[in-house]
């Protein structure tokens, strides 16, 4: 079984565990924790609205409860959290782990990348539907306020995206306590409804859900679209494993989040059983009138926190994809020294903002947005289940039957939700699916194009022996300086070094040929960071290893090398990097031509290598060359 975090061995009295569990409430459970704002309301509307029958109410809430149990508690909390890639979770980390150890690499990578692309697709909807559903509580406070809902939601979203570059480390410390208060509040409100109509507790029996599902034909099938909304944030349970570890996530779930959600959904169902109107948001009707405005404010803050988690997750996943070679280099800004996860990627932030605002304005209400929400994340969960099956069989060494039975249960549930959500395609579900296809295509095109360039560059490499022989024959002068040449191959001499000697007829007496090696693990062990070997007189070949959660910083790396006794002066280094100009010529096939043109566009707009590796501009020498693809 793959290793798990040491924190898992701590007991409940451990103050570190309690602190991490509190933090997990603010980051991990924001999305799933704000789902009661719109889930039960959507389910009742899909069931026909109006005054629903008792079996409809009981069946609906029973399906919600058991979806939370099967998907969130069993699939993600019990199984997925135990399959980590050196402590990291999420579909890209799982893809990297499996592709590193198994032979089914193309299939695993295709499934993993599609799952990641789908997360981006639904990630544009989550902030919109969450904030809208919270602000819509104003309509219950006063019907005349409904005209202000959309402008307020847009203002909140713009502000949220605008402050990302400043970092959220300071206010982020309050996320955990705020979400803890949120879960306590919704749990108490729900318990209040259950006390008024305790017979609703019978819905915990799964027979109610199954009976409603199979005895109501198309209606029973369609409401699965609404039921699924209760677990749209479940993928975050796995993705945030690296931030907190297994034990805090489990502790926060079973200790507060899960019981609070169950009580709230039961409370909403109890309220409808009592005859409450379903025209307005049922969630807010649980609240006594005097406390409605504070609840609306708390709901808005909770949805902002949920949206922040989505945005931060998008930044983190983008960095992973870049380090694994599936996206071009983008500028990554560390917004806080307190945590490596505190980063900002401007391009991702503004594109996400434009997409989210477009959806908010285009759909206008959480009820309409629910028609587009869920299809992409349900497909992501299918992808995760496929990889989970492979992990159970290949990594945990379970036999094929046991692995199939466990994963098969999840597959049936996931496939049912995905099939139901496909009915949303025309009504808006095509939007996240289209976005996912675009992102997947970009990742595939970038990776294939980058591989093509790497192959063409290696063709120009020469051996160390040939290079040393040539500089001796040509009597190349060695000057007392240090030069670093970046390369994509570990052993040979890169073309930029050959060009440098050919044009300048001099060579520094200390030459480091450096390859940056991106690993399929989150972080490289300090002892494995750098391997360096002298392959010729004053010529060293070095390989620097970085995990997909790490950002290469070459000057800091070389400073450590200098501290270890190597005769280099960090202040007197010249960095030589290749600057490729890619062009397309004589492509007859139209599709192939446009694919190559897209790659050229991405390559030209990628962050320069010198910026990405934090090289001092005054010490960088770029050598240009043209490459035809």
Swiss-Prot record:
It is found in: Cell inner membrane. Pfam families: K_trans (PF02705), K_trans_C (PF22776). Keywords: Cell inner membrane, Cell membrane, Ion transport, Membrane, Potassium, Potassium transport, Symport, Transmembrane, Transmembrane helix, Transport. It comes from the Bacteria. One of its GO terms (molecular function) is potassium ion transmembrane transporter activity. It catalyses: K(+)(in) + H(+)(in) = K(+)(out) + H(+)(out). It is a multi-pass membrane protein. The chain crosses the membrane at residues 20-40, 61-81, 106-126, 143-163, 171-191, 209-229, 253-273, 291-311, 343-363, 372-392, 400-420, 425-445. One of its GO terms (cellular component) is plasma membrane. Belongs to the HAK/KUP transporter (TC 2.A.72) family. Transport of potassium into the cell. Likely operates as a K(+):H(+) symporter. This is Probable potassium transport system protein Kup 3. It comes from Legionella pneumophila subsp. pneumophila (strain Philadelphia 1 / ATCC 33152 / DSM 7513). The lineage of its organism: Bacteria, Pseudomonadati, Pseudomonadota, Gammaproteobacteria, Legionellales. The gene is kup3.
């Amino acid at each position: 079984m793959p290793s798990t975090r040491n924190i898992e061995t701590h007991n409940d009295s451990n103050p570190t565990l309690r602190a991490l569990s509190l933090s997990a409430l603010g980051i991990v459970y924001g999305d799933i924790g704000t789902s009661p704002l719109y889930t039960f309301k959507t389910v009742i509307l899909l069931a026909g609205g109006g005054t629903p029958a008792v079996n409809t109410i009981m069946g609906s809430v029973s399906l919600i409860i058991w979806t939370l149990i099967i998907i969130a508690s069993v699939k993600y909390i019990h199984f997925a959290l135990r399959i980590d890639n050196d402590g990291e979770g999420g579909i890209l980390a799982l893809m990297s782990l499996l592709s590193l150890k198994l032979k089914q690499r193309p299939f695993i990578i295709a499934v993993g990348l599609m799952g990641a692309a789908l997360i981006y697709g639904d990630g544009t909807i989550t902030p919109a539907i969450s904030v809208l559903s919270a602000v819509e509580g104003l309509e219950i406070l006063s019907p005349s306020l409904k005209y202000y809902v959309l402008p307020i939601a847009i203002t909140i979203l713009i502000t949220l995206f605008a402050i990302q570059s400043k970092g959220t480390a300071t206010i982020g410390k309050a996320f955990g306590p705020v979400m803890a208060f949120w879960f306590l509040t919704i749990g108490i409100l729900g318990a209040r409804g259950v006390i008024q109509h305790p017979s609703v507790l019978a819905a915990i029996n799964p027979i109610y859900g199954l009976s409603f599902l199979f005895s109501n034909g198309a209606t029973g099938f369609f409401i699965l679209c609404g039921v699924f909304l209760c677990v749209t944030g479940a993928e975050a349970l796995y993705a945030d494993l690296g931030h907190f570890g297994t034990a805090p996530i489990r502790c926060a779930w079973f200790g507060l989040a899960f019981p609070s959600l169950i009580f709230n959904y039961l409370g909403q169902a109890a309220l409808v059983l009592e005859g409450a109107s379903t025209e307005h948001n049922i969630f807010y009707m649980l609240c006594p009138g005097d406390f409605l405005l504070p609840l609306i404010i708390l709901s808005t803050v909770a949805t902002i926190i949920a949206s922040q988690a989505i945005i931060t997750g998008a930044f983190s996943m983008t960095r992973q994809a870049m380090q694994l070679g599936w996206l071009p280099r983008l500028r990554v800004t560390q917004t806080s020294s307190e945590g490596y996860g505190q980063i900002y990627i401007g391009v991702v932030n503004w594109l996400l903002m434009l997409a989210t605002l477009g959806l908010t304005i285009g759909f206008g209400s959480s009820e309409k947005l629910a028609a587009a929400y869920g299809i992409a994340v349900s497909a992501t969960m299918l992808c995760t289940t496929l990889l989970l099956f492979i992990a159970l069989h290949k990594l945990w060494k379970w036999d094929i039957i046991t692995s199939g039975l466990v994963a098969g249960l999840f597959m049936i549930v996931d496939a049912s939700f995905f099939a139901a959500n496909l009915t949303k395609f025309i009504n808006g579900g095509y939007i996240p699916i289209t976005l996912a296809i675009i992102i997947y295509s970009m990742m595939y095109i970038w990776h294939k194009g980058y591989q093509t360039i790497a192959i063409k560059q290696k063709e120009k490499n020469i051996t160390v022996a040939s290079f040393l022989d040539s500089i001796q024959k040509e009597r190349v002068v060695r000057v007392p300086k240090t030069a670093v040449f970046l390369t994509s191959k570990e052993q040979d001499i890169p073309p930029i070094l050959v060009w440098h000697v050919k044009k300048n007829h001099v060579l520094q007496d200390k030459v480091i040929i450096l390859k940056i090696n991106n690993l399929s693990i989150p972080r490289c062990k300090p002892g494995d960071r750098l391997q360096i070997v002298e392959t010729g007189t004053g010529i060293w070949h070095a390989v620097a290893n970085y995990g997909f959660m790490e950002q290469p910083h070459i000057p800091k790396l070389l400073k450590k090398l200098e501290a270890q006794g190597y005769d280099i002066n960090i202040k007197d280094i010249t960095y030589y990097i290749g600057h490729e100009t890619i062009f397309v010529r004589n492509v007859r096939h139209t599709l192939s031509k446009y694919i190559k043109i897209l790659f050229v566009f991405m390559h030209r707009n990628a962050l320069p290598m010198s910026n990405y590796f934090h090289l001092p501009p005054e010490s960088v020498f770029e050598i240009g060359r043209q490459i035809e693809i």
